[in-house]
Each structure stands twice: as C-alpha cells, then as structure tokens.
Amino acid sequence: MRLHEVSGATETVEAAPAKINLALHVTGQRADGYHLLETLVTFTAAGDMIRIRDAATDSFSISGPFGDLLSAGDSGDNLVTRARDILRDALASTGQPARPVDIHLEKNLPVASGIGGGSADAAATLRGLLRHWDAAIAPEKLKSLALKLGADVPMCLASRPLIARGIGEDIEALTDLPELSMVLANPLKAVSTPEIFRRLQNKVNPHLPTPSTIGWATTGWMDFLAQSRNDLQPPAQALLPEIGEITGLLSEEGATLVRMSGSGATCFGIFHSFDAAKNAETSLRKKRPGWYFHATRTI
C-alpha cells in the first residue's frame, strides 16, 4: 500500500491506514488523569483516504460508507480541519505560505471504533498538506503538533509497526514485524472510551515485554502476541457484550489470534493467509449481515 501519491497536477492523495493495537497494556495513571500505556501497533491496507486540492477558500467535505456519521461543517470540531489549522499556524511562524485548500475525506472505517480512524485522518492530513504545500517542518515540531491533536496521532503519523509508550508520545519503530493477514470486525455499536477506563479495575498492570525479534519468523511473533493482552478488552466487553460475540465468531472461522483493538469495539482475527481471511470475511458477512467485516493485510 502506498501512503501517498499525486493524482494529476493539483490533487494530493494521502492514505490514512487503520491502526491496530496488537497488544495494549495499561501500566499506570498520571496525576493529570492520563493513563500510561504500552502498546504494540501496526497498520493495515484498509483505511480512509484524504484528497487535497487548491481552492479559493478553505473547504472540507466527506464521503464514503461511514461519511454520514460525521459532520463536514468546518467548525473546527473535526480532526482533519484542526490538523489543517494547527499546521498552517506552525508554518506561518516560520514564514512558509499555506494557501487555501479543499480537503475531502473518504470515510471507509467505522467511526470511534478503536482503530484510530480520526487520528489516522489527522495524521494523513498533516503528511498530505506538507507535500501539497511543499513545506518543511522539524520532525520533533511535527510530532508535537500531532500530540496536540490526540494521543494516537503521533503513531498514526508514522503509520508503520511500532511500540508506543507513555500516553503515545514515546515511539519505538519495529523493523521486522511480518505481514499479517487479518479480518477486522465491528458490530457497528459505540462503546464509551471514558467509561471503559472508569471500569478498569487495575490501573497498574504488568509491562509489555520488549520483543527480541532478531531472526523471528511469523510463528515467533504469534507466540509473543499470545502472551500479551489488551487490558481494555474486559471492561469494554462488559459494556458491549457483542465484543465477546465477535471474538467467538472470529475464532470459529479459524483465526490463530483474536483480540480487540484499542478501546473497541473493533476486533481483529489473524489468519494464516489472506485467502483464509477473505473466506472468513465472506462467511462472517453471511452470519452477521449488519456488521462490519473487512479482510486486509498489515503494511
């Protein structure tokens, strides 16, 4: 999957890959209330898309299967327009022009579903606008802007396998995570992230081990992942029992590892091949026609 491309002379296209928390350990809580996390993250070919064109004035529009769930009103509430504005202000402080743009979001991922949709869209907007405006910004400054938009935005800015610690600002790239075939599954019901954290009984849990990955094959990674967990899954499932139903369905289809991503409600099942994942997607769509299922690969 190519993260970005230029379509024609005036349109910049930037992919916003889905973020998958293969493991998520809650290891503490700061005095300001933010929870400390350690998470192993990868990204998939499935995702949203950002398209940018020059315009007389700024504008923003949304399409896609989940576009109706978001407002295109340019009020600053959407992370895409917030990313545009915060980047423009940062560039203005260094004397770099940032001309008006029309930004179009193709919303292919379920909204508020634990796979970083909004954060990925914001990160893609930052990447795309820097290319569209032919602008430059120091990496640490860009990371700081991303963190202001949300804890997941810095990792989505990278859009590559990584381990993130703290509230998401401490990122360690992973160079040898193999390609994984998986099915993403969501019952298309919302689950409250704040309520999940309120119901989390243990705020200090065992740390995520640092994988010693030199020479690991896919089986080594799967063994490692099997020993990890998502600490948010039990309270999320208590709030939304369909999460347990999803994981059961994925297991029945032959997934070798099943887990919830982020704070849910999206779950993933890893399969031994993409063909197996596609077959599982077809079967699951028949079993639960009103739910979201998508076979994809990691990038």
From Swiss-Prot:
UniProt-listed InterPro entries: GHMP_kinase_C_dom, GHMP_kinase_C_sf, GHMP_kinase_N_dom, IspE, Ribosomal_Su5_D2-typ_SF, Ribsml_uS5_D2-typ_fold_subgr
EC number(s) given by UniProt: 2.7.1.148
Enzyme's top EC category: transferase
Pathway connected to this protein: Isoprenoid biosynthesis; isopentenyl diphosphate biosynthesis via DXP pathway; isopentenyl diphosphate from 1-deoxy-D-xylulose 5-phosphate: step 3/6
Superkingdom: Bacteria
One GO-annotated biological process of the protein: terpenoid biosynthetic process
Catalyzed reactions: 4-CDP-2-C-methyl-D-erythritol + ATP = 4-CDP-2-C-methyl-D-erythritol 2-phosphate + ADP + H(+)
Residue positions of the active site: K19, D152
Keywords associated with the record: ATP-binding, Isoprene biosynthesis, Kinase, Nucleotide-binding, Transferase
List of residues binding ATP: P110, V111, A112, S113, G114, I115, G116, G117, G118, S119, A120
Record-linked HAMAP family: IspE
Function recorded in the entry: Catalyzes the phosphorylation of the position 2 hydroxy group of 4-diphosphocytidyl-2C-methyl-D-erythritol.
Recorded family membership: Belongs to the GHMP kinase family. IspE subfamily.
Record-linked NCBIfam families: ispE (TIGR00154), PRK14608.1 (NF011202)
Protein's UniProt name: 4-diphosphocytidyl-2-C-methyl-D-erythritol kinase
